Curated annotation (Swiss-Prot):
Species of the source: Saccharomyces cerevisiae (strain ATCC 204508 / S288c) (Baker's yeast)
InterPro entries referenced in this protein's UniProt entry, alphabetically: DDH_dom (IPR001667), DHH_sf (IPR038763), DHHA2 (IPR004097), DHHA2_dom_sf (IPR038222)
One GO MF term attached to the UniProt entry: metal ion binding
Binding site for Mg(2+): 41, 127, 148
Keyword Transport found: no
This protein's name: Polyphosphatase
Cofactor(s) for this UniProt protein: Mn(2+); Mg(2+)
Positions with a binding annotation for Mn(2+): 41, 127, 148
Amino acid sequence: MSPLRKTVPEFLAHLKSLPISKIASNDVLTICVGNESADMDSIASAITYSYCQYIYNEGTYSEEKKKGSFIVPIIDIPREDLSLRRDVMYVLEKLKIKEEELFFIEDLKSLKQNVSQGTELNSYLVDNNDTPKNLKNYIDNVVGIIDHHFDLQKHLDAEPRIVKVSGSCSSLVFNYWYEKLQGDREVVMNIAPLLMGAILIDTSNMRRKVEESDKLAIERCQAVLSGAVNEVSAQGLEDSSEFYKEIKSRKNDIKGFSVSDILKKDYKQFNFQGKGHKGLEIGLSSIVKRMSWLFNEHGGEADFVNQCRRFQAERGLDVLVLLTSWRKAGDSHRELVILGDSNVVRELIERVSDKLQLQLFGGNLDGGVAMFKQLNVEATRKQVVPYLEEAYSNLEE
């Protein structure tokens, strides 16, 4: 980078060093946050958006400069949970980003407590198009959105407001800033490992769920990388397939995790509203191993289910859903496990079974825990959540 610019780790370290009076500007504290699963895509999108906005503000891309105005990238988990994301840790190490330079939930709470009275908290949302439930008491205004999930039609006055189909939200974030920063080569080189890591993971190395936005982002990255052999070699990006394999192996490594760790590693929680009855508190955990592996690692089916029920109680959930996925011999496989009140479980499953092509292989609907093979392997949590929400909204009292 030029001597007047900061790299991503330098930018984050600089933010950490500033007093709150310098971070909050004109009685406004601004953050950028992904969704509560805090996966590679959410973390990469939040850091990239905040960093690129800093470069934009400090540069000559617009007459409307906002030097000294910062967006703080927030990772929507406790600091201690970052270690569960071994793929993210690997990519952060590539960029020489230290854990202590990152901002987590604890940091957001501290910032909110220490700003002067009357300071508003504005947020850009990435990999999400509504305020995360756990942050609703902190965020006053949503001022921008870039996301690739189902459009909830909220915060319609946000700017930018980009909600469109994409394999990875990071692709949308990158393309947005690539254009605003006029293809700045230095910036692309600086954020390439973060962006490519997220895009390659979300698209299975550009083989599945690839959209034009993903192709464009990768093409733009590779066009810059191809002219920087030494930098590319230093970052380990000469072979994107090898880079993907390294990340994927770490993402799939959950050996030694407790059941609670596995459930919260990639977790989202929702409140569904139904016809004339109370809301349904539902949590969904995406897991990279099949149920038989989980049983073998954690004392058998009964012990594993008991620990899931404990997690369910601790989170105040009416329903807990586990979505397992893995690949074998080039084929994708999925399972869906649901725990909760037997009547609610039965009603939900009856309404989504055809869409997800569910086949019972364990438990039973009357016992409040049922396990299914999910033959519709294209349906990820991104599709399962709207299916379940629609099913609950149609339940009669």
